[in-house]
Amino acid sequence: NFFKNHGLFKLKNRPQWFTVTNRSKTYVNKILSQISGEYYKNYEINKIERNNSGVKVYYGSANEFFAYDKVVLASHADESLKMISDPTDSEKKILNNFRYRKNTAVIHSDESSMPKNKKAWCSWNSSINPNNKDNSSVTYWLNQLQNLKISKNIFLTINPFFKIDPSKIYNEIIFTHPYYDENALKNQSKLNSIQNVKNTLFAGSYFGYGFHEDGIKSSIEMLKTLND
């Protein structure tokens, strides 16, 4: 389904891909600019307590909290489950089936991570470890992918198995991505059964293929449930 959804089976008439100018911060800022009420950013959430009248969202070290009618957990499935102080059996049973894998992302300018023939360079470039075929990495050519107006080539390599010149590394980030196995795919269809239970709703890329667009799509569907 993933390959079909992205048109990867097609040799001709493949879909045209587009990149949002200035990346994801553009649509995040666009959404924030349209919020008429107050919003708070960069709060570390300790726990979420729920009752019949609403929800308390605890943050910080002083056990402070915000009180709301409902809460939307638009985070990874495992993170959402960890925040809930009293998860239901269904929430635990369903959300525990979504696993995540740590990935290392390296931003650099080392052209040795790309194909030797520059004519073969593209936005996404995959490499397979010759000593371990189960070990692979992907290098994104950011100049091409994000239309960077600079002369130097900048790359983003995910889980490099090869050495990248340390003098050409600008940043290294560790983050997590959904890991889709049979259990995860089976439980995607069950996620709607835990929506709007105990004043709690869920959204995230794990509802789909793990992309930003999947997160947005799940949010739209979640809002339909919220307004029912």
Place the predicted regions along the sequence by residue.
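Conserved beta-strand termini and adjacent loop/short-helix elements that scaffold enzyme active sites
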Residues: 42-44, 60, 203
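Active-site catalytic microenvironments for nucleophilic, acid-base chemistry
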Residues: 34, 86, 225
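Aromatic-acidic/polar surface patches that form glycan- and anion
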Residues: 17-24, 64, 73, 208-215
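Mid-domain catalytic core of redox enzymes
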Residues: 46-178
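Short, well-ordered alpha-helix to beta-strand connector turns
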Residues: 35-36, 68-69, 197
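Active-site/ligand-binding neighborhood in enzyme catalytic cores
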Residues: 1-48
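C-terminal catalytic lobe of FAD-dependent flavoproteins
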Residues: 164-228
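A structural signal for the hydrophobic beta-strands that form the central parallel beta-sheet
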Residues: 39-41, 73, 202
